[in-house]
Amino acid sequence: MREHRVLLLCLLTAAALAGCTSEQPAQGDTSTPTLSTYSPPTYATAPASTPPITTGPNVRPGEKPPTFPASLNRNDRVAADVYAKYWMQTLDWGYATTDSTLARQAFLPLCTDCERFVKGNFDGARAKGEHFRGGRVSFVSSSIQPNDHRRDSTAVSDVTVSVAALETLDRGGRVIAHAAAIPKITYRIWVRWAGARWFVVDWKEAITQ
């Protein structure tokens, strides 16, 4: 992954997401994943927080915050793959509302790249009275990957999304930054089953082959 500090100009184009870590992109792997008997150590889960904001200047009419289906709150590969997609939806909601609440509920504190991203983009924008126009994330596809147990992950998925063109507006409504649309980009997302639910423990831009 390309090395950047998370600045507001980073925002959520694919380049923004790619710029939220300092390590190399995950290499694509087309091998068939196998079930693992690996048992990671037990860690404290993320604390509960307040409900997410449901309105904002970048929220579409009638749109509600994304939710992870209760029926998929189980420890299996299919549920993990859906949760990886849900992580991207929480980031999309952050760009709709400049609220990091939903995203913060989705990852464990050890995901420092997650923390850096939501703090530098959503929290930073909100503190300055800024908001976004466009930049919304659309799901394209996902695929289960072999688990390398990175940060004691339970499962790994690659999620491909597209990102609309984005503008950042100051509190007076003036455009102060913009970024082009990204038709397609893939992220590798490591998730862990902990405390009877899923959490993100790391994410990187994936180099597909």
What do the predicted segments below correspond to?
Residues M1-E3, T208-Q209:
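Short, intrinsically disordered, low-complexity terminal/loop segments
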Residues E3-H4, L8-C10, A14-A16, C20-V82:
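Juxtamembrane and targeting peptides
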Residues L8-L9, Y86, A181-I182:
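Short hydrophobic/aromatic segments of transmembrane alpha-helices and their interfaces
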Residues Q24-P33, P146-Q209:
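Exposed beta-sheet edge and beta->alpha loop/turn motif
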Residues P57-F132:
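Core segments of small alpha/beta cavity-forming domains
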Residues T90-T97, V140-S157:
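N-terminal short leaders/motifs
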Residues R126-P146:
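A short, amphipathic edge element
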